[in-house]
Curated annotation (Swiss-Prot):
GO biological process terms, semicolon-separated: D-xylose metabolic process
Organism: Burkholderia multivorans (strain ATCC 17616 / 249)
Protein name: Xylose isomerase
Recorded catalytic activity of this chain's protein: alpha-D-xylose = alpha-D-xylulofuranose
Keywords, in A-Z order: Carbohydrate metabolism, Cytoplasm, Isomerase, Magnesium, Metal-binding, Xylose metabolism
Cofactor note: Binds 2 magnesium ions per subunit.
CC cofactor: Mg(2+)
Amino acid sequence: MSYFEHIPAIRYEGPQSDNPLAYHHYDRTKRVLGKTLEEHLRIAVCYWHTFVWPGHDIFGQGAFRRPWQQPGDALERARQKADAAFEFFTKLGTPFYTFHDTDVAPEGDSLREYVDNFARMVDYLGERQQASGVRLLWGTANLFSHPRFAAGAATNPNPDVFAWAATQVRHALDATHRLGGENYVLWGGREGYETLLNTDLKREREQFARFLSMVVEHKHRIGFRGALLIEPKPQEPTKHQYDYDVATVHGFLTQYGLQDEIRVNIEANHATLAGHSFHHEIANAFALGVFGSVDANRGDPQNGWDTDQFPNSVEELTLAFYEILRHGGFTTGGMNFDAKVRRQSVDPEDLFYGHVGAIDVLALALERAAVLVENDRLEAMRRQRYAQWDDAFGRKILSGGYTLESLAADALARGVNPQHASGAQERLENIVNQAIYALR
């Protein structure tokens, strides 16, 4: 059965085409900085927003009528959902996908049913991957939707909930390994608090660290060679989450000796919820040595919640890609569309329109970022700004050649009187705009 029979395979037709079901800028074979666009972007489609979400919101019921979401045998519906998903991936031409365990398999009425159902669906996903050539970018476990996780999973006051969550992660990590996944994501959606009046912060942080340490141990025990990733988010659904932003995650990992084992998966909308730009979070992750992967989406600046819209800003993404490219690009990570169509977008075509447009935006932004990397003007001005630290005096300070006392004495003896130099921000912004808007 075909679920998108009337939708053709999406092809590159160039910027002059007016076909809404074609790529206008994403030519996957085009080479930029020595790689094809497909190799640079490593695009993934997420299972949850695309095939699981029924179109509900807090004020209304599901608006979608997807065939695989209708009542029926749960495992059969899960197989139909997988068939629809891989038909979609194949027609879109994206190389990767991502999932939560309960996206792909019915949870059942017990932990044993969960394990059995998930095992059956992992077998089926393996068959679909083999037939299509689509690969798994990352897997994860849903430790936030069921009421048992209302007070968290790893940070729950009930150790039985901790044990249930550990079981899910064990099987989700095993499945990711078996399916050839390149990363495993840990999103602590409810690892936080609603009120400090009933919360033991120290205990919950220790529980979270113990949980992560167990995941790291299991990764090595089964021989999974992919990356473990935490996805920072400041709040929602909880009032405050312990993985607030990149800097918070890095501090937490360092406190518990996990900084060499776990990196971050950065979502654009989560960055803005934390009061940061997407650019900032990516740059900070590289500076701290924990960059892993990206969830591509956007939020609405007029809303204070996670709207998970498709990315549509070449300007924003150019700066994000500039950081990624100048640090060598993705390794195991990629650009996962953690984005969903709007609730009123009920037609099957809308799923394609959202992804096609966003993929074109990624391609445009990456090419603009490549211009900034190739012309080296931003980097040259950055090097010049810090050049004095590469001189003998600057190197001596950083290498421990001075104490606070001896450095102060030296400054007094030399009568230092440093003058302020321009940061040239306006010129730098002009360089970025020239790269984005120059006619080609």
